[in-house]
C-alpha cells in the first residue's frame, strides 16, 4: 500500500496529503537543526544519569512515608545536574504545572511581600493562585501583593515599566517562558537571561522564578543556566517524555528548593517524605526520552505553522521564526474553525479517536475552553493535543506528539476537518 493510500485509510484525502508533502519538502534544513539540538540535550541527560550512577535499585517502589527513597533522591540529583542547579524537587505528589508553580510561589513569598510579573498577565490558572481573580487560599488572601509590567505592543520587555515596578517589597519575579493562551511570542533563554540580569542589577536580592512549562529541551540552554533561582514545570509535559503519568519539578537554589519541599509536605519534613509509588521507571525513562520526544513535537509545530500560514492564517511563531517552546498558536478567526481543527486532532488520536470535542466550562478559566487530547495520560500536552479558550481572536494552541509522524498526521487531520467544513479551500 502506498503512503497516500495509508493516509486515506486514516481519513486524510489525497489533496490534503499532497498539500502537506509540498510544504514538508521545504522544511528539511529546519528539521536537521532540531535534530542537532535533540542530540545535544540527549547527551546532557545521559551525562547526568551516568554521573549519578543510575541503576536498577533506583526503580524500586516505595510506599507510606517514603523514608530513605534512594530512587527518588537520586532522580532529584539527576534533575539538578540536567538543569545545572544546586537542588531539585521532583515528585508525583506535585499534581500539575499550576500546582508546582503554586508551591514555588507560596514557599518563597511571605505576607507583605510583592510578586512582580514583568512579562504581562500570567497564565489563566495562575490568576486565582495570585488573587487577580478572587479565590480562597490565594496569595492575595495571605497578604502577598501583585504587580505587573505589561509587554510593549511588539511583544518585547518594557524595561522602563519594569524598573518603575520594582520596589523594596518586590521579593520574587515570575517569568512565564511560554505564551500560554496569548498570541505574544514565547521568550528565548537568551531573552530571559537578559531580563534576569536587568532585574537583579536593580535589586540584587530579588528571586526569579521561571515557568518553564513547554520549554524544556527546546534549546540547548535552560533559564537556570541564565541565573534563574527556580525553574518550574510539569512531568506530563516535556521532561516526562510522555511516560510520566503525573508529577512536577522545581529546580533551583538549595534555599528555594528547601522551602518548596517544606511547603509541599510540612515544615520539618521537607524532602525526607514522599513515596514514589512505583513511578521511578517512568520518571527516569521519560526524562531519558524527553529530548527526542520534544524534537518530534517541535517538528510538528514548525509543520503546522508552515501549513496554516500558507493558507492565510496568522501563526505565532510564524513559519520561519525560531522556536522557544513546543506550542504553535494558529488564529482561526471563528468558533466553528476552532471546533473543526480540534475535531481533526481528536480524530488522529490513538485513544478516544471516536470522541467529538466540544467547548466546556473548564475549572480555572474564565471562558469556555475546547480541548482535543486523545492521550494515554489525561491532560498530557507532550502528547498530540490542541486547545484554546473560545474567545477573540479564536486562536487554537497546538502542541505535542510523542512521535513526529503522529504530529504530522494530527496536523493533516485538522486541515482535513477545516476543508470538510468549507472553511478552507485548497
Regions found by a protein language model. Name each.
Residues 309-426:
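Conserved C-terminal alpha-helix-loop-beta "cap" of PLP-dependent enzymes
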Residues 3-28, 35, 45-58, 66-69, ...:
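Conserved PLP-enzyme active-site core in the AAT-like
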Residues 38-42:
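Acidic, PIN/NYN-like endoribonuclease modules and their adjacent C-terminal/linker elements
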Residues 76:
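Generic structural marker for isolated residues within well-ordered, non-membrane alpha-helices
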Residues 58, 62-63, 89-92, 326-331:
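Short glycine-rich or small-residue beta-strand-to-loop segments that form or flank ligand, phosphate
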Amino acid at each position: 500500500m502506498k503512503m497516500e493510500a495509508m493516509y486515506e485509510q486514516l481519513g486524510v484525502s489525497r489533496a490534503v496529503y499532497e498539500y502537506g508533502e509540498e510544504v514538508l519538502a521545504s522544511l528539511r534544513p529546519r528539521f536537521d537543526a532540531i535534530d542537532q539540538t535533540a542530540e545535544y540535550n540527549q547527551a546532557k541527560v545521559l551525562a547526568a544519569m551516568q554521573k549519578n550512577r543510575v541503576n536498577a535499585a533506583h526503580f524500586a517502589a516505595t510506599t507510606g512515608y517514603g523514608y530513605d527513597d534512594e530512587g527518588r533522591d537520586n532522580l532529584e540529583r539527576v534533575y539538578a545536574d540536567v538543569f545545572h542547579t544546586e537542588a531539585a524537587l521532583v515528585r508525583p505528589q506535585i499534581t500539575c504545572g499550576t500546582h508546582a508553580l503554586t508551591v514555588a510561589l507560596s514557599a518563597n513569598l511571605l505576607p507583605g511581600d510583592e510578586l512582580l510579573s514583568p512579562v504581562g498577565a500570567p497564565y489563566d490558572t495562575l490568576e486565582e493562585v495570585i488573587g487577580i481573580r478572587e479565590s480562597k487560599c490565594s496569595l492575595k488572601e495571605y497578604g502577598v501583593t501583585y504587580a505587573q509590567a505589561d509587554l510593549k505592543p511588539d511583544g518585547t520587555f518594557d524595561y522602563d515599566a519594569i524598573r518603575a515596578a520594582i520596589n523594596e517589597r518586590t521579593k520574587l519575579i515570575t517569568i512565564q517562558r511560554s505564551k500560554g493562551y496569548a498570541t505574544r511570542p514565547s521568550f528565548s533563554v537568551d531573552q530571559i537571561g537578559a531580563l534576569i540580569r536587568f532585574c537583579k542589577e536593580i535589586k540584587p536580592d530579588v528571586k526569579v522564578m521561571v515557568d518553564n512549562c513547554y520549554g524544556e529541551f527546546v534549546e540547548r540552554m535552560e533559564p537556570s543556566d541564565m541565573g534563574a533561582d527556580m525553574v518550574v514545570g510539569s512531568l506530563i509535559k516535556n521532561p516526562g517524555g510522555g511516560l510520566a503519568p503525573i508529577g512536577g519539578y522545581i529546580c533551583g537554589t538549595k534555599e528555594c528548593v528547601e522551602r518548596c519541599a517544606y511547603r509541599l509536605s510540612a515544615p520539618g519534613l521537607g524532602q525526607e517524605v514522599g513515596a514514589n509509588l512505583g513511578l521511578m521507571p517512568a520518571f527516569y525513562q521519560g526524562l531519558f526520552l524527553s529530548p527526542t520526544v520534544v524534537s518530534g513535537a517541535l517538528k510538528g509545530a514548525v509543520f503546522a505553522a508552515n501549513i496554516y500560514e500558507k493558507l492565510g492564517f496568522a501563526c505565532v511563531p510564524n513559519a520561519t521564526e525560531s522556536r522557544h517552546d513546543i506550542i504553535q498558536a494558529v488564529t482561526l478567526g471563528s468558533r466553528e474553525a476552532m471546533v473543526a481543527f480540534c475535531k481533526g486532532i481528536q480524530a488522529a488520536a490513538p485513544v478516544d479517536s471516536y470522541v467529538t470535542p466540544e467547548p466546556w466550562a473548564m475549572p480555572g478559566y474564565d471562558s469556555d475552553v475546547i480541548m482535543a487530547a486523545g492521550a494515554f495520560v489525561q491532560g498530557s500536552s507532550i502528547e498530540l493535543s490542541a486547545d484554546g479558550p473560545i474567545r477573540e481572536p479564536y486562536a487554537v494552541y497546538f502542541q505535542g506528539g510523542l512521535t513526529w509522524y503522529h504530529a504530522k498526521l494530527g496536523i493533516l487531520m485538522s486541515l482535513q476537518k477545516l476543508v470538510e467544513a468549507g472553511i478552507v479551500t485548497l
